[in-house]
């Protein structure tokens, strides 16, 4: 089944508020995640809300990595979308969750742009949950 893109939608919980509340730290994490996922960075923008929370995006040649955070809840809404065959969005997601020190992740992988016989497009969705123990240095 050929697909134009892979879109990961991640609900990350139990994240370190000091990490997900720091726009500069998230930018560093996303730039490294793009590198690890074999993505070519084109631009980035991050905004720190008052009193807390960050929204940001890294535009990559293959599509984007974006986030909205709620440090007071330890929650981050993460999106990683890539097109093409060379990028590895799952590596980027894994690295971001590790750096956010997420305790839990609900992940949906959407295979987008699946061409139908009548030249329309559809998608498939695979969803899973992971309990993570990252705060104690365990993967």
Curated annotation (Swiss-Prot):
EC top class named in words: lyase
Repressor keyword on record: no
Residues with PTM Pyruvic acid (Ser): 63
PTM characteristics: Is synthesized initially as an inactive proenzyme. Formation of the active enzyme involves a self-maturation process in which the active site pyruvoyl group is generated from an internal serine residue via an autocatalytic post-translational modification. Two non-identical subunits are generated from the proenzyme in this reaction, and the pyruvate is formed at the N-terminus of the alpha chain, which is derived from the carboxyl end of the proenzyme.
Cofactors that this protein relies on: pyruvate
InterPro entries xref list: AdoMetDC_C (IPR042286), AdoMetDC_fam_prok (IPR003826), AdoMetDC_N (IPR042284), S-AdoMet_deCO2ase_core (IPR016067), S-AdoMet_deCOase_pro-enz (IPR017716)
GO process annotations (BP): spermidine biosynthetic process
Record keywords: Autocatalytic cleavage, Decarboxylase, Lyase, Polyamine biosynthesis, Pyruvate, S-adenosyl-L-methionine, Schiff base, Spermidine biosynthesis, Zymogen
Site (Cleavage (non-hydrolytic)): 62-63
Pathway participation: Amine and polyamine biosynthesis; S-adenosylmethioninamine biosynthesis; S-adenosylmethioninamine from S-adenosyl-L-methionine: step 1/1
The protein's assembly and partners: Heterotetramer of two alpha and two beta chains arranged as a dimer of alpha/beta heterodimers.
Role played: Catalyzes the decarboxylation of S-adenosylmethionine to S-adenosylmethioninamine (dcAdoMet), the propylamine donor required for the synthesis of the polyamines spermine and spermidine from the diamine putrescine.
Family the entry assigns: Belongs to the prokaryotic AdoMetDC family. Type 1 subfamily.
Protein name per the record: S-adenosylmethionine decarboxylase proenzyme
